[in-house]
Amino acid sequence: MARTLVAGVDTSTQSCKVRVTDAETGELVRFGQAKHPNGTSVDPSYWWSAFQEAAEQAGGLDDVSALAVGGQQHGMVILDNQGNVIRDAMLWNDTSSAPQAAALIEKLGAAPAQDGEPEDPIARGKQRWVKAVGSSPVASYTLTKVAWVAENEPENAKKIAAICLPHDWLSWRIAGYGPVTEGEDAHLEALFTDRSDAPAPSTTMPRRTNTAAT
């Protein structure tokens, strides 16, 4: 009886790895790996090329029954309404959006303290962000990078139709449709909340229902 094979794809900061495994036993059957470019920003097309190379090294995926993709967090891939990449992806290790992170916290903390809230406006802003989306903005987060684009590249910001993480983009390319993301990933990037009573943190981008690609 033919065994069932599944594949795992890890599109990390440094490389793409493809692992083909026996679904029943967990035995490693084949493996491939290809490097990604160094740096804090990258053209997503390199991720696709690396995936193709790694998949070829792993003997191809034609006999695989299922495939899952995971990878680096906190990157920003912005797409237009045709699904085209607007600019190089800003990775988690790009900290140029630190001023935007601070500004987002300051803005949400500006209103007077309510019952039980800290008197310090920065602490208050962080607390309100956590209440709204589960985390407080830092320079590595996707949201702050979007705010950076809005402030520094307004023409690119106007083109944004969807925002996704690096492995979301690769999942879309592999599946042939999308873009997609997990709710948990969007939540970690301060892009999503499942709370109907949460305050609406304002950024320099208009609020829209597809802020996180779905």
Regions found by a protein language model. Give the residues of each.
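Gly/Ser/Thr-rich active-site cleft segment
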Residues: 11-13, 115, 129-214
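Carbohydrate-associated surface elements
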Residues: 94
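Pocket-flanking alpha-helical
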Residues: 99-104, 122-125
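Glycine-rich phosphate-binding segment of PLP-dependent enzymes
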Residues: 102-109, 210-214
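Structural signal for hydrophobic packing residues in well-ordered secondary-structure cores
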Residues: 24, 55, 59-62, 105-112, ...
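Intrinsically disordered, low-complexity terminal tails and inter-domain linkers enriched
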Residues: 109-124
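Generic beta-strand or strand-like secondary-structure segments
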Residues: 50-53, 100-103, 148, 169
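N-terminal glycine/serine-rich phosphate-binding loop of ATP-dependent small-molecule kinases
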Residues: 1-88, 99, 131, 159
